[in-house]
């Protein structure tokens, strides 16, 4: 399994290396060979050769650098998405892919992969989050964002139990299109939500008949504990 960690040195704001470490460990438990290529500005990306492409959160300055460099891969990125390659984008990296993005306070053209535009919030939002996907699977994480997206036609999450919705409608968050998964959720996404990591592993391996379900007991207990604590804190508020 070949994984591309895009802009690994610029987009590792919230422990994104940890996300790929967890994913790699889960794959190895299934006796898969895993190769992670760490790519950044100056490297020549050949996105089609990868089974999964990952991009994490960026500081404002690093966002500007990546926004400029990533433009040349827009067509290739669109092709790999349509080819049903797996992609996971977390934090503000999802802002790169719309029609408009905000770079250092200015609205500029995005990569145009999706139709949404980025809108600034009145003030930065920070807080824990509990989101439900279309199958009512509950995801937990943290949000630290200065913007939202104006419209999402194919949301990943359709119920916001706790946290900030990703659109002005206040009902949806994230993007799920084919095998593209994008969300503002961080902290880190795959480490906190073990079941999603298991899902990715199954899909990357082609849902093999010999897939053996690992208990992931510690990860499951940590998830349950986090969720219980988040809900408890929500009631206290």
Language-model features: locations:
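Pocket-forming structural segment of enzyme catalytic cores
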Residues: 103-174
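Cysteine-nucleophile active-site neighborhood
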Residues: 58-135
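N-terminal beta1-alpha1 cap of cysteine-dependent amidohydrolase-like domains
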Residues: 1-79, 191-192, 198-237
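A glycine-centered loop/beta-turn motif at secondary-structure junctions
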Residues: 167-205
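Active-site-proximal beta-strand elements of phosphoester/diester hydrolases
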Residues: 4, 140-145, 181-185
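Structural motif
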Residues: 52-56, 88, 182-184
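Glycine-rich beta-alpha junction loops
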Residues: 7, 146-148, 187-189
């Amino acid at each position: 399994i070949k994984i591309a960690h895009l802009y690994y040195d610029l987009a590792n704001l919230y422990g994104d290396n940890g996300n790929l470490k967890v994913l790699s460990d889960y794959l190895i438990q299934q006796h898969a060979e895993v190769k992670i290529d760490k790519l950044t500005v100056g490297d020549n990306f050949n996105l089609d050769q990868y089974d999964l492409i990952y991009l994490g959160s960026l500081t404002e300055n690093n966002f500007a650098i990546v926004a400029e460099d990533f433009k040349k891969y827009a067509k290739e990125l669109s092709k790999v998405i349509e080819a049903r390659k797996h992609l996971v984008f977390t934090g503000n990296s999802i802002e790169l892919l719309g029609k408009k993005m905000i770079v250092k306070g200015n609205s500029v053209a995005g990569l145009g992969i999706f139709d949404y535009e980025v809108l600034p919030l009145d003030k930065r939002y920070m807080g824990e989050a509990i989101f439900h996907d279309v199958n009512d699977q509950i995801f937990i994480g943290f949000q630290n964002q200065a913007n939202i997206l104006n419209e999402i036609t194919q949301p990943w999450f359709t119920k916001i139990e706790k946290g900030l919705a990703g659109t002005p409608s206040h009902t949806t968050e994230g993007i799920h299109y084919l095998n593209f998964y994008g969300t503002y959720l961080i902290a880190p996404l795959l480490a906190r939500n073990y079941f999603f990591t298991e899902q990715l592993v199954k899909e990357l391996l082609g849902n093999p008949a010999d897939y053996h379900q690992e208990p992931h007991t510690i990860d499951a207990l940590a998830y349950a504990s986090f969720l219980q604590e988040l809900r408890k804190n929500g009631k206290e508020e």
